[in-house]
A protein has these predicted regions:
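Sec-dependent signal peptide recognition
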Residues: 5-13
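Hydrophobic h-region of N-terminal signal peptides that target proteins for export
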Residues: 13-22
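Polar/charged, Gly/Pro-rich intrinsically disordered segments
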Residues: 25-68, 93-145
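Short, non-transmembrane amphipathic alpha-helical segments
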Residues: 74-94
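Soluble non-cytosolic domains of exported or imported proteins
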Residues: 25-29, 73-78
Length: 145
């Protein structure tokens, strides 16, 4: 009887250890290197011109510059933010903010800077917990630069 109890304890201990450490976490550098690979999977993805991870005012920021086509502007912005959310959820330390610089391919239109709260954006794109209207109002800030 004591052997069975010992086996049960060992099994439970192993199960807890595996479940706690089951999700792989990546460094900031690894996350930054995964973004271009994510974009390479889709031939309609916008072109990436810069990827950075940095800290500012105690916040961790994932920064991405993309070239956008004004005909597919909305889709390219959402694609880039979705990619940032999908990849960054695997970071060892979570990001606070996503910064997306959209460089226009037309000189008549100004470039735009999009700042999005990372947790809210991940909840919107990955877990589908935040509806689009709420995400746009509460989590997103778009300004011309």
């Amino acid at each position: 009887m004591s052997h069975i109890n010992n086996y049960i304890r060992i099994f439970i201990t192993l199960f807890v250890c595996i479940s706690v450490h089951g999700k792989t976490k990546f460094t900031d550098r690894q996350v930054a290197m995964m973004i271009p690979k994510y974009f390479a999977r889709d031939h309609n993805a916008p072109k990436i011109t810069r990827t950075r991870v940095y800290g500012e005012n105690g916040k961790k920021i994932l920064h991405l510059n993309i070239e956008v086509n004004r005909n597919r502007y909305e889709n390219q912005m959402e694609y880039a933010l979705s990619a940032m959310a999908s990849v960054s959820q695997h970071a060892a330390r979570p990001f606070d903010t996503f910064v997306l610089i959209m460089e226009q391919n037309s000189r008549q239109v100004n470039d735009e800077k999009v700042e999005a709260k990372a947790k809210c954006t991940i909840d919107h794109f990955v877990f589908k917990r935040v509806k689009n209207d709420r995400w746009v109002k509460k989590c997103l800030n778009v300004e011309e630069i």
